[in-house]
Amino acid sequence: MSMKTLPKERRFETFSYLPPLSDRQIAAQIEYMIEQGFHPLIEFNEHSNPEEFYWTMWKLPLFDCKSPQQVLDEVRECRSEYGDCYIRVAGFDNIKQCQTVSFIVHRPGRY
């Protein structure tokens, strides 16, 4: 059995070991968040160091969001304005008062 060496890229999260997610795959993740009752929000940052806890929020969390398409539209808008930044979608649980899900949907120089 031969082992494959991964390219020397910085890994950020579980999904970073996969090829970049398509809009359809991102929509499926967002749909899961909405079904769980989490409020989606979009954040961006110039760097994606694991030590950086504070990202800039893109607008306000989408509290009234009912469809993944609404979030995808905001992701596209954020990509067009901050294409040189990392962009992630996060899910906020207002009962536990914490972020429960987050994944990167855009890496600079990738799309």
From Swiss-Prot:
Biotechnology: Heterologous expression of 12 carboxysomal genes in E.coli (ccaA, ccmK2, ccmK3, ccmK4, ccmL, ccmM, ccmN, ccmO, ccmP, rbcL, rbcS, rbcX) leads to the formation of bodies that resemble carboxysomes, have densely packed paracrystalline arrays and RuBisCO activity. These structures open the door to generating carboxysomes in plant cells to increase their photosynthesis and productivity, as well as tailoring bacterial microcompartments to specific metabolic needs and molecule delivery.
InterPro entries: RuBisCO_ssu, RuBisCO_ssu_dom, RuBisCO_ssu_sf
Pfam families listed in its UniProt record: RuBisCO_small
Presence of the UniProt keyword Magnesium in the record: no
CDD domains: RuBisCO_small
Keywords: Bacterial microcompartment, Calvin cycle, Carbon dioxide fixation, Carboxysome, Photorespiration, Photosynthesis
A molecular function (GO) term: ribulose-bisphosphate carboxylase activity
Subcellular localization(s) per the UniProt record: Carboxysome
GO BP term, pick one: reductive pentose-phosphate cycle
Gene Ontology CC: one annotated term: carboxysome
Gene3D superfamilies reported for this sequence: Ribulose bisphosphate carboxylase, small subunit
SMART domains in the record: RuBisCO_small (SM00961)
Statement: the UniProt record of this protein carries the keyword Nucleotidyltransferase: no
Matches recorded under PANTHER family: RIBULOSE BISPHOSPHATE CARBOXYLASE SMALL CHAIN 1, CHLOROPLASTIC
Function as written in the Swiss-Prot or TrEMBL entry: RuBisCO catalyzes two reactions: the carboxylation of D-ribulose 1,5-bisphosphate, the primary event in carbon dioxide fixation, as well as the oxidative fragmentation of the pentose substrate in the photorespiration process. Both reactions occur simultaneously and in competition at the same active site. Beta-carboxysome assembly initiates when soluble RuBisCO aggregates is condensed into a liquid matrix in a pre-carboxysome by the RbcS-like domains of probably both CcmM58 and CcmM35. CcmN interacts with the N-terminus of CcmM58, and then recruits the CcmK2 major shell protein via CcmN's encapsulation peptide. Shell formation requires CcmK proteins and CcmO. CcmL caps the otherwise elongated carboxysome. Once fully encapsulated carboxysomes are formed, they migrate within the cell probably via interactions with the cytoskeleton.
Additional observations: RuBisCO folding and assembly commences when the nascent large subunit folds with the help of chaperonin GroEL-GroES. Both RbcX and Raf1 help folded RbcL release from the chaperonin and dimerize; dimeric Raf1 binds to RbcL(2) leading to an RbcL8-Raf1(8) complex. RbcS displaces Raf1, resulting in holoenzyme formation.
Protein name per its UniProtKB record: Ribulose bisphosphate carboxylase small subunit
Biological source species: Synechococcus elongatus (strain ATCC 33912 / PCC 7942 / FACHB-805) (Anacystis nidulans R2)
